[in-house]
C-alpha cells in the first residue's frame, strides 16, 4: 500500500489578502463561490491517493489543547484527535470513540462505553484506555477550563470500557448533544505532567488517536501533511490514502 499522506495546503495570508481587498461579489468578479478540493489518483473503489485542502489558517500552534491555527481547526473536525461522538449527514449523533451511552437518574448520569477494547492506539503506539477518558475530563475542566464538559461534575470508572459521568442540573442531553461531538481525547501519559497545557507545544503535543496523524510540517511553505492510520478507522473506510 502506498504511503498514506493527507496533504494540507495552508495559504491563509494570501487568501485573506486576495479577498479582503475586493468588494466584488463572486458573480461580479467571475470567480465561482466554491471550488473542488484537488484530488489525485482516484481508483475504481473511490479511494483518493492524495487530497489537497486549502484553509485560511496559519500552521501554528500545533497542539491538541488549541482550536486555533490550522492544526487546531483540523482537530476540531477530528483529524488527529479522536472525538467522543460524530454527527452524520442528517446532523444526528453517531458513535465514535464513545460507542454507546445511556442516560440515567433523570438526566443526572451518563453511562458511557468507549472503544478501549478495540485495539485503538495513540499515534506514538501507546494503547487508548479508559484512564485516558477520565483524565480528559479532569484536564478539560480543571486545567484547560473548557466549557464543553463543564456540566460534568464527576467521573466513576465502572470497568475497563465504561464510566459514569455525573452531570449537574440534569444536563445529560445537553452534554451529549452540544458538547460530546467537540470533545477531543487527550493521552494521559503525555499531558498528566504538563503544568500549563494551554501553552504546551512540544513535539508530542500533536499526538492523538484519530484517523490521521501529523507527519510533516513546512512552515516556510505553509503546508502540513497527515498520514492515515490505516485503511479503516472505527469500522469506517478511510478513503483518502495520501
Question: What are the language-model segments listed below?
Answer:
Residues 149-194, 213-218:
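Surface-exposed binding/hinge segments that line
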Amino acid at each position: 500500500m502506498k504511503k498514506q499522506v493527507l496533504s494540507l495546503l495552508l495559504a491563509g495570508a494570501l487568501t485573506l489578502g486576495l479577498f479582503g481587498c475586493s468588494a466584488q461579489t463572486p458573480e461580479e468578479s467571475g470567480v465561482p463561490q466554491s471550488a473542488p478540493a484537488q484530488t489525485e489518483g482516484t481508483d475504481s473503489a473511490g479511494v483518493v491517493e492524495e487530497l489537497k485542502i486549502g484553509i485560511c489558517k496559519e500552521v501554528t500552534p500545533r497542539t491538541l489543547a488549541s482550536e486555533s491555527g490550522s492544526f487546531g481547526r483540523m482537530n476540531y473536525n477530528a483529524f488527529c484527535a479522536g472525538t467522543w461522538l460524530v454527527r452524520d449527514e442528517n446532523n444526528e449523533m453517531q458513535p465514535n470513540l464513545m460507542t454507546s451511552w445511556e442516560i440515567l437518574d433523570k438526566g443526572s448520569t451518563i453511562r458511557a462505553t468507549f472503544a478501549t477494547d478495540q485495539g485503538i492506539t495513540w499515534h506514538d503506539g501507546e494503547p487508548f484506555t479508559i484512564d485516558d477518558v477520565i483524565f480528559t475530563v479532569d484536564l478539560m475542566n480543571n486545567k484547560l477550563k473548557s466549557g464543553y464538559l463543564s456540566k460534568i461534575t464527576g467521573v466513576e470508572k465502572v470497568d475497563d470500557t465504561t464510566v459514569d459521568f455525573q452531570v449537574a442540573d440534569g444536563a445529560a442531553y445537553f452534554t451529549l448533544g452540544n458538547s460530546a461531538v467537540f470533545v477531543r481525547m487527550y493521552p494521559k501519559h503525555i499531558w498528566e505532567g504538563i503544568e500549563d497545557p494551554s501553552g504546551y507545544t512540544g513535539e508530542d503535543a500533536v499526538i492523538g488517536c484519530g484517523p490521521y496523524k501529523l507527519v510533516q510540517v513546512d512552515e516556510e511553505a505553509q503546508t502540513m501533511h497527515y498520514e492515515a492510520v490505516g485503511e479503516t478507522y472505527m469500522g469506517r473506510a478511510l478513503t483518502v490514502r495520501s
